[in-house]
Amino acid sequence: AGWRVAQWRVSVRDGELRAELLRQAIDISRTINPQRVKALSFSASDIEKPEFQRLCGQMRAYGRILEVRGIYSMAVREGAIVFGPESFEPGDPLANPPGTVYGEPSAAHWEVFRTGRPSTVGPYRDEFGSFISALAPVLDSRSGEMLMAIRIDVEEVQWRAAIRREQWVVAAVVLVLALMLVGGGLVLRHRDRLPAERQARVRFSEYHLVACLGLALTVVVAKALNDTEGQSDREVFRHLAESQAGRLAEAFRDLRDNQLDGLVRFFESSEHVDRWEFRRYAKAETRPPEVYAIAWAPRVCAQEKDAFEQSVRDQGIETFHVFEQGPDGVDRPAFGRDEYFPLLYLEPTEENPGAVGFDLVSDPTRKTAIHHAIQTKLSTATDLVMPFLRPGPAVVLYAPLLTLPTSVAEPHLARASVQEARGVLSIALRLDAILRRTAITGEGSSLFVVMDLYQLDVSQPPRFLGTSSPDNAEHADFARSGPGLSGKGLAGFFVSYPIFAFGKSYVVNVHPGAGFLAAHPVRIGWTAGLVGV
């Protein structure tokens, strides 16, 4: 019976781990921008492409917090499966240059490309070792075409170690019960050998043995029922968390496709963009509440700075000048750089007084993001920054403008090449606001789920960015918990989802809020325990 229970628990645990690994592969495939994949050829030439480098960096950062061997991407080219972006560092034995042919794919690998359905594979052996893998397709959102597959590997040794722990738990329980039976039998046998006058102290040994066995079995049954109830509650919460994470991911896609890209399209399609047209655009567009400013900052070379300042003054802003903040926080004229990115258009102006003219690259964090956006020609997010004249941290999204009509206010741009970035368009937002907007609440505004957002980096621990909890009271420290990052228990349970956006790798930990815990109290295990006692 103990062996059968152990095999059953192993089967259950194996299914749980496979489902969790597959969920992670699906989540990664969903967060990847299909447009970035379309830019790849899955050949050696990809290694120089910003899209390839960005995907590798995001996979690498996210793979660091997963207890897996690696994250790959694969595509079919000329009848063979080839590798693309992956999480491995250069020099890793499993690292493959883009376009490397997968030498020993199994039939199950090909089946994913044939059907376009996610699947788990293994254990199997290939040229890299023995693994259990999860594969999920990355689909074109418009045509439904399968662009590539995401593959997550766990080494078979690591997998079997996780499974073996379940066997040891069952074995320990069976051993304790067996020792109690053997010990009780020895006591009874010893009692029967004693003279009648010495048996008084052990006269009721049968009752004691039955009570101990009953108590032990009660504990085992109560624990099993508690685990079953907890697993049921966790499944309910997983569905809720998936919906919640989907809303957050959709909010990020809206920021990318509608808010930031829409601003870029507006500039690219206009023959003349002046301050008033920018203001009309800002007022006409529906802004989500987390976006507190949109802006345009032209690229101004040092030789043209004085002429640029004068041209803006001639347009009606008589006190305009390009400035920065000194170490003491006091404004001072910007100087000493080859180029400047001063805020020229900023909306809503009345909510951001005194910011026009601020040189964005005077701040190291903003400068890093702006230069990366220009070099890659891809939209890029900053790390957390302090907003100009606003309390609390924020994140700024930058998109390089590669085509811009020459306006009267910007004569210094007339001689620039059409291939160069004319400047950057930006959206400033508060991440805690986007988390709270997408949060699900119950009665009395109690949170059913709490979302904690972290930024991931290969060289640093996860950095906390914000939480949907209004007072941060329910914010939990970041933790790892096996493949898929799903914690155990219920109060300590959380589900993690990746978000690859604006060149960053984020992870959102979704855990039960007070509303969910109140609606799903753990009762059945305690009830069984009390009845058993």
Language-model regions: role of each:
Residues D14-L17, V187-P195, G230, V533:
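Juxtamembrane alpha-helical signal-transduction segment immediately C-terminal to a transmembrane helix
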Residues L22, M148, E155-Q199, V449-R463:
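Juxtadomain coupling helices with adjacent low-complexity linkers
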